[in-house]
Amino acid sequence: MSKKALERVKAVLKELKYEPNAYASALANSRRYDFYCLMPKHESEAYWEEVEQGQKKCCEIRRDFHVHVTFKYYKRNNLSSFKEQYEKILEAKPDGVVMVPAKLDYTRQFTDQMHIMNIPFIMLDSYLPDLRPLAFYGQDSFASGYFAAKMLMLIAHDEKEIMLMKQTLDGVNVASKQQDNREVGFRHYMKDHFPNVKIHVLDLPYQSTKKIHNQLLEGYFLKHPDTHHCITLNSKAHLVGDFLLKTNRRNVQIMGYDMVEKNANCVRNGSISFLIAQHGYQQGYYSIDALVRAIILKKDVTPVNYMPIEILSKENVDFYRRTQI
């Protein structure tokens, strides 16, 4: 084609606002895309397993683009394991990363290296805008904690005291920034609307055994017999729920987060009043899909994606659509 003819073709394409079909081009490309996911080590039926299942489902749906995801796990109570795993990821030079942040300074070391290496990354769980992720998927933690307090006090409005159950890594710090922000929202609501309600904090240490947890719970309720409503801002409400059922404390309930099966059983049996669902499966699915759209299809992605806050109770817990996309 002559230069003059080429210019005429370009002019016509511009006039028609033609854009190349990125989808068709990507399908024609046989290149493999390797994504890595760094998340906390978790047990079966835990919240993070839901996230992982969603990511695997997205890879299955997007298999025509030769997308593969490798999972790396770190221990919440061992920051050196976070560093060890992210160094392995950097060594692999992946096309994209999905990560659940650890402590800010360690997380920043990882994200700084990814920026240097031009590796786009998605954040789950905690939104840290200063680290400049490609996108974030998760709840608005402050709003979620505020909402949790509001729901709790609908049934505890006449109480003089409530219990806040926490799980710390070292006697001070909880497992994630997300939980910190939820507590800020929770306490903000309580201060504004129920300033006279006493909030007792009970720490069930992250590394302790169930036997120790039950001893701590027994000691708490012997000391505070007037506590009838409890809340936790993590996915371990069943630690208290199971204890309440075992000790036949039918006049006490706890509220918590995440539709994991252990929590759901406590809801069905009445020891957990409400659960707030975070839609982990959807977070996992959309996080991988965002990498596909940005890296392979060359599409813009929405940087901040807050998940809906869904409340579950005994009446609707069995209708929760865990894997709906």
Question: Which residues are covered by each model-predicted region?
Answer:
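Hydrophobic alpha-helical segments within soluble ligand-binding/sensing domains
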Residues: 136-163, 213-214, 279-296
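Hydrophobic alpha-helical
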Residues: 89, 96-116, 198-263
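Hinge/cleft segment of the Venus flytrap/periplasmic-binding protein
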Residues: 12, 16, 173-174, 190-193, ...
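Flexible loop/hinge segments that line or gate small-molecule binding clefts
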Residues: 105-143, 260-268, 272
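N-terminal helix-turn-helix DNA-binding module of bacterial transcription factors
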Residues: 1-30
